[in-house]
Design a protein with these regions (language model features):
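Membrane-proximal helix-turn-helix segments that form the acceptor-binding/catalytic region
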Residues: 75-79, 98, 102-106, 119-120, ...
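Conserved donor-binding/catalytic core segment of Leloir-type glycosyltransferases
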Residues: 200-216, 221-226, 234, 339
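N-terminal subdomain of nucleotide-sugar transferases
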Residues: 1-46, 223-226, 302
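A charged, aromatic-enriched C-terminal amphipathic alpha-helix characteristic of glycosyltransferases
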Residues: 333-364
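Carbohydrate-associated surface elements
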Residues: 159, 180
Length: 367
C-alpha cells in the first residue's frame, strides 16, 4: 500500500483513513506493507495488527516536500517489487503522485488507484500557483496519467468518480467505496470527557472535530458562535495556521488524543460539519464518527454529503448553518429522531468492516 503523503503518527483524516484501511486488511489475513512517512520512534502501534508492516520514506518538512517524498517513494516501490512478490499495489493518489501505479506498471504488477478527493480542487484551495496555466496543465496531466497507469481503482463517492472521469474517462469504471468509522471506539457508551466541568459550560454544546483547513467551513463555525451567544461551540482540531477569533462562547481546545474524541462527542448535543460551497467529493469521516456516538448531525448540503449521509443528517445550504442550529436544538423530538436514525445507519452501513469487504472484492476483481 503506497501512501507517501501520509504521516504516521498524525491526526489528519488521511492518516486515520489509511491506517484503518491497512490495519483492517491485515486483520483479514492479508500481508500488508504500508509505505508512508513513518516515524518509528513516535508512532504508537499498540492497537495495530502486529503483522502490519511499515516501509518508511523521508519526511522533509520543507516547502515542496511532495517532490522529494514522491521520488523516494517511486524508488522504494521499485526496489520492493524487485525483491519481493506482491500480488497488487494499492496506491493512494494525489497531485503529481502515482509512484505506486507507475512502478507497478513497469514491474508487471497489478495496481489500483485510491482517490479520496478532487485533487485539482484541493490544490486550488491550497495554493494560488495552481491557477497558473503551466502548473494547472501539468497537474491535470498528472491526474490523467495516474488513472491511465492503474489497472483499477476506487473513489470515495459517486460524485468524485464523475468529477475525475473528466480527467480520464477510464475512471468511469472505478468502484465507489465510502470511508468507514471505528465502531469499537466511537460508541454511545463512551465515558464523557468532562468538558462541561473543565470549561464550566452551561447550555447546549455544538461540536466540530477536524483540521482547520480550507476544505472545511471554518468561517461558518465562527458565525454560528457569533449569532448564537448562548450556544457553546467547541472546536477540536488544529493545523493550517487558522486562528479563530476570541469569543466568549467559542472554545478552540486544540487536538485531542484519538481516544478522547468520542468522549467529547457523547457529551455534546449536536455535531457540526460545515463545508464551503465547493464539492471536493469527500466521504466525511467526522460525520460517521458523530453518528457512531449517536450525535445528531447538521452538515452542509453538498452532493457528496447527501450521498454519504443518505437522509440521516440534517443538511442546510452553505452559509445557513448559524440560523439552522438553534431551530434544531429547540426541537427535542427531531434531535432524538436524528440521533437514532444516524446511529442505526452508521453502525450498519458505514463501518470500516464494510469498507474492507468492498476493498478486498476490488482486489480480487483486479488480480
Amino acid at each position: 500500500m503506497v501512501a507517501p503523503s501520509v504521516r504516521v503518527p498524525d491526526t489528519l483524516g488521511q492518516t486515520l483513513h489509511q491506517l484503518a484501511l491497512a490495519n483492517g486488511l491485515a486483520n483479514r489475513g492479508l500481508d500488508v506493507t504500508l509505505l508512508c512517512r513513518y516515524d518509528s520512534k513516535n508512532a504508537n502501534t499498540q492497537n495495530l495488527n502486529p503483522e502490519l508492516k511499515f516501509l518508511s520514506i523521508v519526511n522533509p518538512g520543507i516547502p515542496f516536500e511532495r517532490i522529494i517524498f514522491t521520488r523516494q517513494s517511486y524508488r522504494k516501490v521499485l526496489s520492493e517489487l524487485g525483491s519481493k512478490k506482491y500480488d497488487i499495489v494499492h496506491d493512494r493518489g494525489y497531485i503529481f503522485a502515482g509512484s505506486g501505479v507507475k512502478a507497478a506498471s513497469e514491474m508487471g504488477v497489478k495496481s489500483i488507484l485510491q482517490v479520496d478527493d478532487n485533487w485539482m480542487r484541493s490544490e486550488l484551495s491550497a495554493t494560488k500557483v495552481a491557477r497558473l496555466w503551466p502548473y494547472n496543465q501539468k497537474a491535470i496531466r498528472s491526474c490523467r496519467d495516474q488513472i491511465e497507469k492503474a489497472d483499477g481503482g476506487f473513489t470515495v463517492s459517486t460524485i468524485l468518480r464523475d468529477q475525475i472521469s473528466k480527467w480520464n474517462p477510464k475512471a468511469n469504471n472505478f468502484a465507489v467505496i465510502q470511508n468507514g468509522y471505528e465502531d469499537n471506539l466511537f460508541i454511545p457508551e463512551a465515558k464523557p470527557l468532562g468538558i462541561r466541568e473543565k470549561l464550566n459550560l452551561k447550555g447546549d454544546i455544538a461540536v466540530f472535530v477536524g483540521a482547520l483547513g480550507p476544505w472545511h467551513g471554518t468561517d461558518e463555525l465562527v458565525e454560528i458562535a457569533k449569532r448564537n451567544p448562548d450556544l457553546n461551540v467547541i472546536v477540536a482540531g488544529g493545523g493550517y495556521g487558522h486562528n479563530l477569533p476570541k469569543l466568549s462562547n467559542l472554545y478552540h481546545i486544540g487536538r485531542l488524543e484519538r481516544s478522547e474524541v468520542p468522549a467529547l462527542l457523547v457529551e455534546s448535543d449536536i455535531g457540526l460539519a460545515p463545508y464551503p460551497n465547493v464539492d471536493y467529493g469527500f466521504s466525511p469521516l467526522k460525520i460517521y464518527e458523530y453518528m457512531g456516538c449517536k450525535l445528531p448531525v447538521i452538515a452542509t448540503s453538498l452532493p457528496s454529503v447527501k450521498e454519504a449521509t443518505q437522509g440521516h443528517a440534517l443538511l442546510v445550504p452553505s452559509g445557513q448553518m448559524a440560523s439552522a442550529v438553534p431551530k434544531v436544538l429547540s426541537n427535542k423530538k427531531l434531535l432524538s429522531e436524528l440521533s437514532e436514525s444516524a446511529y442505526s445507519y452508521a453502525s450498519s452501513r458505514r463501518t470500516w468492516e464494510n469498507t474492507i469487504d468492498k476493498t478486498i472484492d476490488l482486489y480480487k476483481k483486479t488480480i
